[in-house]
């Protein structure tokens, strides 16, 4: 495995998704911004139905006015070679207890002890990972069957970095079974089981949270090689949340890099 790209740590536990970061506020989100228009008081009311993505600017203005929003459509033919200042290093080979909950927006897994990744020489600690019934990002317009978002945060700067693992229909995933069977409980999980065999190739760009408050300056890493999940597993997650994905946003002046 290439250490310059992606690997998972001896202190890490489990990963998570990225849009939802109720347990961390990015450094650049001031209290004024977060509370504007009653954001903090009303954030719990956003959803994917009557208060869905087209109304999220009512909960956080950034969702409607931000110029660097996520998710986006990745067009491989329009990407640039990776700036290696942003190479990602994860350290695998860990297992530990993690709590699994239905938080009203997705199925979320939170490790008892945080893991970490290294990004441009800085450490980002694992906060949680969660699932979307379909991928939020698309590649050449294609939406994957499922996605896991692994959310990490720099403890000093509070900047966020999210690793996205796509899933396609195929062989059953052991780690997904563990998650499905233990919602509302704690269970021992190994984060290495969530990663594809080829975790050394990915897309990178700077975007945002994919849920309110839609805060920007989030480092996104989307693994190119998907994992597989059985038809039954995919259908089970969609029983919880069939449409918990935000529509793709405009790229504007951003560059998508590929490694």
Please annotate each region the language model reported.
Residues 2-8:
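Sec-dependent signal peptide recognition
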Residues 4, 18-259:
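Alpha-carbonic anhydrase
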Residues 11-12, 39:
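Residue-level signal for mature regions of secreted extracellular proteins and peptides
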